[in-house]
Amino acid sequence: MRHIILDTETTGLHPNQGDRIVEIGCIELENRRPTGKTLHFYMNPERDMPEAAAAIHGLRSDFLADKPIFASVAQEISAFVKDAHVVIHNAPFDLGFLNMEYQRLGQPPFTQMIPGVVDTLIDAQRMFPGKRNRLDDLCQRFGIRNDHRKLHGALLDAELLADVFLAMTRGQNDLGMDHPQELLSSQMNLQKSHLPTDLKVLMANDTEIHLHEQLLQEIAKKSKQPPSWLQ
């Protein structure tokens, strides 16, 4: 299966109030492996860049002045994502902008060009309820290095999201599943086992406690740091 990991940067939050896309980054996965194919454009938004938005991604009007407008790269974007499931973190945001950009050109919405969308934010909220699930949070949770991410950037964020997506959906191939939602559903449908409530509690004796402490010391010595559960 072909996936396109996609991210955008914009002039603001409201595509229906004149905000525009200023950067798009896409990475292709084929059967869960990066193919090396990417798509990346900076775009002239044909309007001013609010300072609040520039503070997030660092893109300002002088840098974007000589970049192509969306209309001139729209066909390349559609061709790149054609027939692929698109993976986005907080999909309604990016899809709202992409749909509006194509609507301005009198073309069908972006969502009609693709067979499906995976929203990693929704999947993360199901996997980690009650926790923060921003891209940075997921990188930290899955041990993905992101210390080079000082500002938001569409291609950089797509690269990080590709790693997060693969970490979140690891094992899908073995289960014969195409979507993270299916994996989560299979986990949530597991039958509960009811254990008796009068189980006898066995406490460790002094010898067992001593041996356990020796084992922890040996682990700390070999790893050159205390076991993570003691930190």
Residue ranges with predicted function:
Residues 1-115, 125, 137-151:
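Conserved non-catalytic scaffold segment of RNase H-like nuclease domains
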Residues 74, 132-135, 209-212:
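Alpha-helix initiation and N-capping motif
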Residues 85-91, 97, 134-191:
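Acidic, Mg2+-coordinating catalytic module of metal-dependent nucleases/exonucleases
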Residues 93-120, 207-231:
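Long, acidic, intrinsically disordered low-complexity segments
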Residues 114-132:
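Catalytic subdomain that performs nucleotidyl-dependent activation
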Residues 167-231:
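Acidic two-metal-ion nuclease catalytic site recognized across multiple nuclease folds
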